[in-house]
Amino acid sequence: DGLEKIGMETGPLAVWLWNELKKRAAPIVCMDARHANAALKMMPNKTDRADAAGLAQIVRTGWYKEVSVKSHDSYLIRASLASRDVLVGVRVRLENQIRGLLKTFGVMFGKRVGGFARRAEEIIAGELDVAPEMRMIVETLLNARNDINEKLKGLDKRVRSLARTSAPVRLMMSVPGVGAITALSVVSAIDDVKRFRRSSDVAAYLGLTLRRYESGEISRTGRITKRGSKLTRTHLYEAANALLTRNLGQSDLRDWGLRIAKVSGFKKAKVAVARKLATILHAMWKANLEFNPKGAVA
């Protein structure tokens, strides 16, 4: 009784605390930890009790930036995507380890029709005479890679199932280069289409806008801010890469990106297209419209 508002910072347990307190109809707000930390730095003593008192003062005065906590379903989607990303990373490290070990003994992996596994089996069968003891090591690493692939198949099946049941995801997949993973990543990062009044704000939220520094006569533009979800930012960059480098059909967006590539190089063009994709995907979701290849790109 008498409880007016509860304030907490973003952190590892913030989602669980938020959901549990919401179930109890508690008047809770989740604050941006960076903003709260700036205020707490003014406290003379750093203790848990002092931090709690400082947070209470921040909530009382209203001097905080409220953070939107995503829904349970969005976090489940992101858990699947993050787990898949970890397994893909482990697979790449295993492949690089196998290549590196074989190169030490003069065996060049190269590329073969049929993929990595077939080439590794060829090497195990007939190219390790100079170091027979390496067969067991390579087989162990290859078996681990095969196990990872089996787990990835299960996660990919779940991702495809989630994509089929989501109307916004199917809508976003009408954009060339945007697959189920990228679309799910964007939808789960935004969570609520009404969260952003302007579609252009999504690019800033995902850390794809350029840093700006102005002071007196100094004015310069830096690299992208890289705030927000690194995973979704990476997915958008990969989608931009596919759009620009694969033959996925002509569109004004692709032509725009290629013009930037001619002037500034492909790396900057991919970042620019990823930034534009973030805006376009939100606008499509908001308007419930499929991608228009001849849509204006401003």
Language-model segments: what does each one mean?
Residues 62-65, 94-95, 152, 191-195, ...:
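Short helix-capping/linker segments at secondary-structure and domain boundaries
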Residues 1-29, 38-39:
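Glycine/alanine-rich phosphate-binding loops at beta-alpha junctions
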Residues 258-298:
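Basic, amphipathic alpha-helical segments enriched in Lys/Arg and hydrophobic/aromatic residues
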Residues 56-60, 81-84, 88-91, 95, ...:
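Short, amphipathic alpha-helical segments that act as regulatory/interfacial helices
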Residues 171-174, 180, 184-266, 298:
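Phosphate-backbone recognition surface of nucleic-acid-processing proteins
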Residues 80-171:
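Glycine-rich, often acidic, oxyanion-interacting loops/wings at catalytic, nucleic-acid
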Residues 22, 28-79, 86, 116, ...:
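Short alpha-helix plus adjacent loop in nuclease-associated cores
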